[in-house]
């Protein structure tokens, strides 16, 4: 690997390491909630699972929208525009609050929709009990994701990791205390699990905000000044970039929801095997998710500074390293499927043998699945670093719903492949996305490179403007930062 590429890899890994750890901490929180639901019995597990899936689908879209904040902060950081970066974070908090309110109202009143989809009334009752507590996690979750994007985009992801791990540990301790009624605490059941998650989720952004406020390294980023005056232009910019990102997250999540429904049609054993295999895939997938965020921020910094050649190099390094990591996980899925399934299920129990055997066969397909999924996710992040989310949405929509879903249904039912057919269909859609998004990144950078000289000149002008410049400033690839924002 050439020296410039090695520099980019080190920079991406410095960001990706803490972000991967933060993602795994979130997985640990979800796993803890699931285990605690299981302690309450199968009925509570079914109801809690229904509520958790509903919450995850809605919150995933919201997270996608506020993910745009990190993109914009990285671009302005590359342009040495601290005031613009702070303005993006402040506006992101307003967008996150609005999304939390809208999503909360939707989840609070979800009961009629769940009944329309044929869910058992008693299961819906339990799910709503869980959701009525969990809904209050949304404001904190959105605020944390905004602040996480802000601090990571300026190359300070360490506190995100520390607070995420602390949150996961607090979630475990409090959940266990409420479930077991320790220290005189009441046993609150599903409502208690949702309440604990909401409490932890709202404490995490407060801790991160306090850290940002007290650390001298953030002195030039004034997040409080002007927080009460949302900037319409910046809010619109976040939504222009964020809505397609949220849409991409939603259509991908929808594809996996369809896969789960297909497994339910095939049979209970197929559904159980699918859930076990998807958990293994989900844990491994946190690596490319962290790499994707890191690649987005690194490219955004180069893009903001007008360094298009370096942006392309960072994208290629990120995509290549993501594929390599997933190839290693693929090797584990090929060579050690029984051991991996054993982490989730007692394979020796007679009642589990059929499910375990089916899950092992799905992991063999998951090896290809992971390689494609990891590559497409990092490529998606690379394109977003160039402030383009529309391309990722269109490619994702086409590959997930015009290739992945039809192919899964065709192979599972028409071809008679059953559960394996569903997973090969998903792998086909993800392979299409991996190829399409990688080519889209190359096409995008090839179009931008002729403008590199002009971009560099613009970046120099941006720096020359300085903090005291009374006029609006323009960073490459950005809308102008209003003079009021610069004054903040």
UniProtKB/Swiss-Prot annotation:
Cellular-component GO terms for this entry: membrane; periplasmic side of plasma membrane; plasma membrane
Any Pfam family: MatE
GO molecular function: antiporter activity; transmembrane transporter activity; xenobiotic transmembrane transporter activity
Subcellular location per the Swiss-Prot or TrEMBL entry: Cell inner membrane
UniProt keyword Membrane, yes or no: yes
Family: Belongs to the multi antimicrobial extrusion (MATE) (TC 2.A.66.1) family.
Membrane disposition: Multi-pass membrane protein
GO terms under biological process: monoatomic ion transport
The protein's name in its UniProt record: Probable multidrug resistance protein NorM
Listed transmembrane segments: 11-31, 55-75, 97-117, 127-147, 159-179, 190-210, 247-267, 271-291, 317-337, 355-375, 393-413, 421-441
Keyword match Methyltransferase: no
This protein's UniProt keywords: Antiport, Cell inner membrane, Cell membrane, Ion transport, Membrane, Transmembrane, Transmembrane helix, Transport
Function, as annotated: Multidrug efflux pump.
């Amino acid at each position: 690997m050439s020296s410039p590429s090695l520099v980019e890899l080190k920079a991406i890994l410095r960001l990706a390491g803490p972000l991967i750890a933060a993602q795994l901490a979130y997985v640990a929180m979800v796993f803890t909630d699931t285990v605690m639901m299981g302690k309450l019995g199968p009925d509570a597990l079914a109801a809690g699972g229904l509520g958790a899936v509903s919450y995850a689908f809605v919150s995933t879209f919201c997270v996608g929208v506020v993910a745009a904040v990190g993109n914009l902060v990285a671009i302005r950081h590359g342009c040495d525009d601290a005031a613009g970066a702070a303005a993006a974070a402040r506006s992101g908090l307003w967008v996150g609050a609005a999304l939390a309110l809208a999503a909360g109202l939707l989840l609070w009143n979800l009961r009629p929709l769940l009944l329309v989809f044929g869910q058992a009334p008693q299961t819906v009752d339990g799910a709503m009990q869980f959701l009525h507590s969990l809904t209050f996690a949304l404001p904190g979750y959105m605020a944390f994701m905004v602040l996480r994007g802000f601090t990571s985009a300026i190359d300070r992801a360490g506190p995100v990791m520390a607070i995420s791990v602390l949150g996961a540990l607090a979630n475990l301790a409090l959940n266990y205390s409420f479930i077991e009624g320790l220290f005189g605490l009441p046993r609150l059941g599903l409502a208690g699990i949702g309440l604990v998650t909401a409490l932890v989720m709202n404490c995490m952004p407060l801790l991160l905000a306090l850290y940002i406020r007290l650390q001298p390294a953030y002195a030039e980023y004034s997040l409080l000044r002007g927080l009460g005056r949302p900037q319409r232009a910046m809010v619109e910019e976040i939504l222009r970039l964020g809505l397609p990102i949220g849409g991409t997250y939603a259509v991908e999540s929808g594809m996996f929801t369809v896969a789960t429904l297909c497994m339910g049609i095939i049979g209970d054993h197929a559904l159980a095997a699918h859930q076990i295999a998807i958990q293994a895939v989900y844990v491994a997938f946190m690596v490319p998710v962290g790499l994707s965020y890191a690649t987005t921020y690194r490219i955004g910094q180069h893009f903001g500074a007008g360094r298009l050649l370096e942006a392309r190099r960072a994208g290629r390094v990120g995509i290549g390293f993501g594929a390599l990591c997933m190839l290693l996980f693929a090797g584990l899925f090929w060579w050690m499927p029984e051991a991996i399934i054993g982490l989730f299920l007692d394979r020796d129990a007679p009642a589990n043998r059929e499910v375990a055997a089916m899950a092992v066969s799905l992991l063999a397909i998951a090896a290809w699945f992971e390689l494609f999924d990891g590559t497409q996710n990092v490529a998606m992040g690379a394109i977003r670093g160039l402030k383009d989310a529309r391309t990722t949405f269109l490619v994702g929509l086409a590959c997930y719903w015009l290739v992945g879903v039809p192919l899964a249904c065709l192979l599972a039912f028409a071809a008679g492949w059953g559960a394996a057919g569903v997973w090969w269909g998903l792998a086909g859609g993800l392979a299409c996305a991996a190829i399409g998004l990688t080519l889209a990144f190359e096409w995008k950078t090839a179009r931008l490179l002729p403008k590199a000289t002009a971009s560099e000149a613009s970046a120099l002008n941006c720096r020359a403007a300085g903090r005291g410049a009374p006029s609006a400033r323009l960073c490459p690839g950005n809308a102008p930062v209003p003079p009021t924002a610069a004054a903040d």
